Amino acid sequence: MKANHRTLLAVAVLCGICLLTVLSIPRNHTIRSVARVQVETPAGTVPILPWQVRVTYADRTREWRQVRWSGTDREAEAELAARPAGSVYRVQGFLLGDNATEEGYPVEAEVTVVADPRPGPVPVARPLPLRDVRLTGDNRLTGNRDLDVRQLLSLDVTRMLYNYRDTYGLPTEGYARPQGWDSTDTKLKGHGTGHYLSALAFAYAGTDDPALRDSLLVRIRRMVDELRACQERTFVWSDRLGRYVEARDLAPGEELYALKGTWEAFDRYKKDWRSYGYGYLNAIPAQHPVLVEAYRPYNNRDWVWAPYYTIHKQLAGLIDIAENVGDAQVADKALLIARDMGLWVWNRLHYRTFVQEEGTPEERRARPGNRYEMWNMYIAGEVGGMQESLARLSGLVADSEDRARLREAAGFFDAPAFYGPLAQGLDDIRGRHANQHIPMTVGALQLYGLTGEPRYYAVARHFWELVQGRYAYATGGVGNGEMFREPYTQMLSLNTNARTGRQGIVHPDPDINETCCAYNLAKLTKDLNGYDPDDARYMDYYERVLYNQIVGSVHPEHYGVTYQYAVGLNAAKPFGNETPQVSCCGGTGAENHVKYQEAAYFVSDKTLWVALYLPSEAVWAEKGVAWRQDCAWPAESSDITITEGGRFAMKLRVPYWAGRGFEIRLNGRRIARSFVPCSYAEIPERDWKAGDRVSIRMPFGKHISFGPDKMETAVTEGQPQTPFAPMWEGALMYGPLVMASPDITTWEQAEFSLDADLHEIVPCGADAGEGTMGHVYTLSLDGKTFYPDYYLTDHATHYLRLDLH
């Protein structure tokens, strides 16, 4: 699209945090209106600039377009953060996919620095509990769920318990040895058992089938009973101390530095479970987390893996049982185990650790237990969602002293080296291990809920905004080789990890979009949405990552889930990880497919938000309200029928991709003449009666999700070359769906010259192909067929080289 800057037209459009002033260009589908953004930012921070703006074309159609902003290197960001209050400055940006310049269509942001920091928000809405929402119908969602549940019920419980019994000196005869990352020769063992507990709890909450619940409960009860038996072996009284042996008593003083991390040492530690400290529960001895205080590195042979990561998985699993399982005896025992383990964490970190931010790394490590250094170590310092679990746990226990200690324990996982820059809006994501740090931002939001300190909310919000604008792919996933790379380099990442294929041809085969990252980004998004449920960007993103990575991350016919996802050229989904013990993504994969509905509906005292269009039945227990949502999946139309009435307002998400033909009717009458994409349409508070029906029509349309950089010759040594002229790369979208083609196997085949209105792309309708479960939308372009990503299992190409004119 060639821009023409002859005419200037000022139009004010409210778009999230920005006020838009637009340029007019009178051509058919060329840009008529683009954004100049005006924002305020507190002194000492980098501004949050929008990563999408509303664009109007000459034919008066509109859509959201992505923006890439300049000045993202560390030095430039530090300079912006240093601007004093009262300063006004401009930041240059470009709309992606446009050929007005080599970098895109120019836009500009005007930033005003203000003195006062923004106050932190208060929680507005909460998702309906998982037990109160049921998926319905015969579709890909319910098919995946049922496949997951069958797999959970097929697994050998003894394999989940073997390492615990071995670590606590209990007989292991008749117990199968686990495999994968939970095998006896890894130091991450226990993580898969925690995920298994969570998956069982979610499966239990998501069904109303009594027989299925009974089958799940048998496994849950045995797991809880045996884990408690292991934990009780740490209840060791010391006459010398006049109390039970506690976490703080393990390896005091110089003994900490004498601890070894070898397997020979760990075999000795397993014989000394009496020293672990009251309440310790893990599949590996307590010396494992203690070694982190001496800054021992990630090394499975000689030192540690990720001790607190495994502790978190077990805590999370037990808490999920306590919150979701209807058997009071089992739920109470799970909570008791979690409480005692949470208090072990408090005891150890309260008495044996501290925070010192000043000085060199050597000075900060002069004595053991500096949490600034502990939580900033690669992998060894990975803590999963410890803040989140301890915060949740503090809200479940009855004793006030226990509650206070658990809240304090959650605060011990404050990570100054990571949180500090993010609180200022500085991009400290680059170069970090993705799934080590995404859960830490989930934890920051939980700490905000506990303390009310705005900096914690700023950490979570800034992280989310940076991910959306600088790091996410069209599928919603992030990461290359488990890492955040440099900002705005997604397309370069697609051309990494050279492999030699047939005929000796070198081709890229990148490890892109770890599935655990999608799991945790969805969790962060759901939690942020509770603070601002009217900001439809949150659930637009949740829909994107759910539909285009999570749903497609399990094979629809035989159970297997992905670790890295398939986003590159002619990439195949690497299904495997058949049990939660095989890998981290085997663990999150076991959970993913039994909780699709967890963010479908949010409620406040007087309002219901319909956030996702999924075939489901739901109950709003506090109001005695119930409804049924009837639709296909994915849905171009949906009917919400009230089955038990009450008084409330209803807000329905208008997706960012909504276009012509979108409408909402209440009992047959339109509620508005027009709707704004990426917003919520409100039906004001009213008395709803059984039989009232809300009908949503949302025809899918075509658009492109562009990468922020143009793929040229790869600059990484040893990578395959792409000797092409620089072009925009983008993924073809149909409504919320990323469309990919198995007919494209080379970058030459992926190159297209298209009109900006994309009329060359022909929709074939929902009946064009039969899917594994239900009908499948397809598109046709130049003799090549495109399918939704979730439908594809083998080789396909997502990103195309595009010249729009």
Protein language model features and the residues they cover:
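Bacterial Sec-dependent signal peptides at the C-terminal "C-region" and cleavage site
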Residues: 8-29
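Aromatic (Trp/Tyr) and acidic
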Residues: 11-15, 120-210, 247-274, 286-325, ...
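Solvent-exposed, low-complexity, repeat-rich "mucin-like" stalks and linkers
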Residues: 28-62
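Serine/threonine-rich, repeat-prone extracellular segments and beta-strand-based repeat modules
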Residues: 59-112
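Helix-terminus loop motifs that line ligand-binding clefts
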Residues: 211-296, 471-483
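Hydrophobic, small-residue-rich alpha-helical packing segments that form membrane-like cores
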Residues: 336-439, 446-450
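C-terminal beta-rich recognition modules with glycine/proline-rich loops and embedded aromatic residues
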Residues: 460, 539-548, 553-641, 676, ...
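Short strand-turn-strand beta-turns centered on an Asx-Gly dipeptide
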Residues: 665-672, 735
